[in-house]
Amino acid sequence: ELGLSEAQQTLLINNLRDRVIVRTDGGLRNGKDIVIAAALGAEEFNFGTIAMIAMGCVYVRKCHLNNCPVGVATTDPKFRAKFKGTPEMVINFFDGVAREAREIMAKLGVRTLDEMIGHPEYLKQREVPEHPKANLLDLGPVLKDVIPDLAKHQGVGESYLSRICKA
């Protein structure tokens, strides 16, 4: 989260935000993660391992050895025969992620993901009674709104695209 927040803040301060598409990756598992990443400035979200788990991966970390015991990550016919995954399993997972993100945004009064992008004011640090030391963390720099009342997300500007791409 810190890197994402710092990238967003730096791009805004230097008036470069409309020239970059910010993508986040690693550790995204649910709709809440999407909403948090969007509020911190992410516009695109990559899912890796969790999508494989939705297909049936049991996470034995043997992908590179070509002997995945459930056939998710292998070309060996012996192991491929064990694969029971379907496209619907992954579709159902992502439908759930999208539904959860929409529910959270609705509670915040946000209608679209674009309205959420780059607005850390929707986030607040919560108290964690079961982990007292976590309450000592100062998330102020991560949740800082460096340029209040500014449109934080406008997508990559057309003028910039026209300068770097020939028609």
Regions found by a protein language model. Give the residues of each.
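Terminal amphipathic helices with adjacent charged low-complexity linkers/tails
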Residues: 110-166
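Glycine-rich phosphate/ribose-binding loops and adjacent secondary-structure elements
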Residues: 1-81
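Active-site or pore-adjacent capping/gating segments
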Residues: 45, 53-120, 124
